[in-house]
Amino acid sequence: MLVRNRYLGELLKNSRSFSVLNSSVRSGHNKWSTIKHGKAKNDAERNKINNKFANQIAMSVKLGNGITDPSMNIRLATSIELANKNNVSKKVIENAIRKASGSSASGKDSNASELCVYEGMGPGGVAIVVEALTDNKNRTIGLIRSAFNKANGSMTPTLFFFDKKGYVTMVPPKMLDTEDKVLESVLEIQGIEDIAPVQEDAEDLECDTETETTGQTYEAVMEPADTNKVAALLKERGFHIRDLGIGYNAKPDMEVFVQGDETLEKLQKLTTALEDIDEVTSLYTNASNA
């Protein structure tokens, strides 16, 4: 996006050097250029969204032991629901499922994607773990290494900074309108190690306006092997499952407080560059806000 904006800026700057005699024609041309570049930008954003959701769907199939039936794979069902809410087309969803199962639209076998984990150290000594779903590991690791190098970071083991945990993000039914009621309702669910309210974006909260829920989002943490079981039990109790998966939580004694605006800006630039890689599905750091 930044490259495109700089390119458009150069076009606009150069247009001011043209003869004033051609101003009326140039005005129409510039309007068309603006519309054209605006459409290209929107198309690029849409493609980025489609790619991210397609990877999440494919990963849901992979982590669900290859089960492609949403009724039997709760993570896949949740991923498809999120994709639909973000206007991802049926074709994109179906292709993502085929990609994960190793077959193409024609029914022939294709190169199945693999789940890969990459480790690195970023600005300020921040440990980073990157998850990606890729059908070309050499290409993906090249892109990730390039992002680290440009930020003066390095690819080095960092998994020991984190605990691997399962998580379920959900919204309680309306009758559970306080945190105490929520905690009491999940006491009998075995496997939950911790549960707490989390802050969600306004756009995400709007997605639940049609459901009989409180609007407050909670996240439960458990061992990875218990994730699907816990999600199914929460759903039985009326919780709306927003997301679930397996991720990496920074160990409390391994968290790093990022000092200085310049370092923070460099770290943000690196994480953005990593997230912009199509194959990247998740990114975790041990940076602390405290």
UniProtKB/Swiss-Prot annotation:
It is found in: Mitochondrion. Gene3D superfamilies: 1.10.10.200, 3.30.70.980. It holds the Pfam family Transcrip_reg. Belongs to the TACO1 family. Transmembrane segments: none annotated. InterPro entries: Integrase-like_N (IPR017856), TACO1_YebC-like_2nd/3rd_dom (IPR048300), TACO1_YebC_N (IPR049083), Transcrip_reg_TACO1-like (IPR002876), Transcrip_reg_TACO1-like_dom3 (IPR026564), YebC-like (IPR029072). SUPFAM superfamilies: YebC-like. Its main location: mitochondrion. GO terms for cellular component: matrix side of mitochondrial inner membrane; mitochondrion. One of its GO terms (biological process) is mitochondrial translation. Keywords: Mitochondrion. It comes from Saccharomyces cerevisiae (strain ATCC 204508 / S288c) (Baker's yeast). This is Probable transcriptional regulatory protein HAH1. Present with 1780 molecules/cell in log phase SD medium. It comes from the Eukaryota.
